């Protein structure tokens, strides 16, 4: 029983219990996004199973994004941004999985620290950017919505291994396809969602 203006008012306890607290709704939403990303990861791992088994592709899971990491040697010849036929086939398999998804997709290109200087690629910035763009164009041709796609080249600036050995340099030469969770309910719009995920990823890289 509640009181309003001095008069008792009956409150239905069942109705009160049926109203979810905002924090509960947010937890349910986040849990749903995590489940969605796990489902997407399973689909992609199934589509790329042979390349994953051979070590040419790695799928890295987090709650709010997936990273599909391609060894550059699978996709490109040294110093080139033209996709190899074998690499195209693998990317087409991934693209087929992306067509039916609403998630934003960013393709990132990375190189080792060996300098390049050519008419097409004055530096590793241009090479990494061109490689990422080549993958985006393939996805677009396969039917992935252009509005969901973006690409960026980081050159040699974000190594994941040492550049003093050939093995380390080979790991650094990579293309990463990042599939973002949809977090529009937690932040202001898609651009805010993508910015939040990027900040989380940068924090992970710095650890």
Q: Would you name each region that the model predicts?
A:
Residues 1-71, 185-206:
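Juxtamembrane linker/hinge segments adjacent to a transmembrane helix in small membrane proteins
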Residues 2, 6, 45, 49, ...:
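Sec-exported extracytoplasmic/periplasmic mature domains
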Residues 33-36, 40, 44, 87-90, ...:
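Stable alpha-helical elements in mature extracytoplasmic
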Residues 39, 43, 52-56, 61-65, ...:
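Extracytoplasmic
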Residues 75-90, 110-195:
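Periplasmic OmpA-like peptidoglycan-binding domain that tethers envelope proteins to the cell wall
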């Amino acid at each position: 029983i509640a009181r309003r203006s001095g008069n008792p008012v009956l409150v239905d306890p069942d109705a009160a219990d049926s109203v979810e607290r905002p924090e509960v709704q947010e937890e349910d939403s986040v849990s749903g996004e995590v489940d969605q990303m796990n489902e997407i990861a399973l689909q992609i791992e199934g589509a790329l199973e042979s390349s994953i088994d051979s070590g040419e592709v790695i799928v890295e899971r987090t709650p709010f994004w997936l990273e599909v990491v391609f060894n550059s040697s699978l996709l490109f010849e040294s110093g080139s941004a033209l996709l190899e036929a074998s690499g195209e086939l693998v990317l087409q398999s991934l693209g087929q999985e992306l067509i039916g998804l609403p998630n934003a997709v960013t393709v990132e290109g990375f190189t080792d620290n060996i300098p390049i200087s050519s008419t097409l690629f004055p530096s590793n910035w241009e090479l990494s950017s061109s490689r990422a763009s080549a993958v985006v164009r393939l996805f677009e041709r396969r039917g992935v919505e252009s509005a969901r796609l973006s690409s960026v080249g980081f050159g040699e600036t974000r190594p994941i291994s040492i550049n003093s050995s050939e093995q380390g340099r080979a790991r650094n030469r990579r293309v990463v396809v990042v599939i973002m969770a949809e977090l529009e309910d937690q932040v202001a719009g898609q651009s805010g969602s993508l910015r939040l995920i990027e900040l989380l990823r940068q924090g992970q890289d710095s650890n």
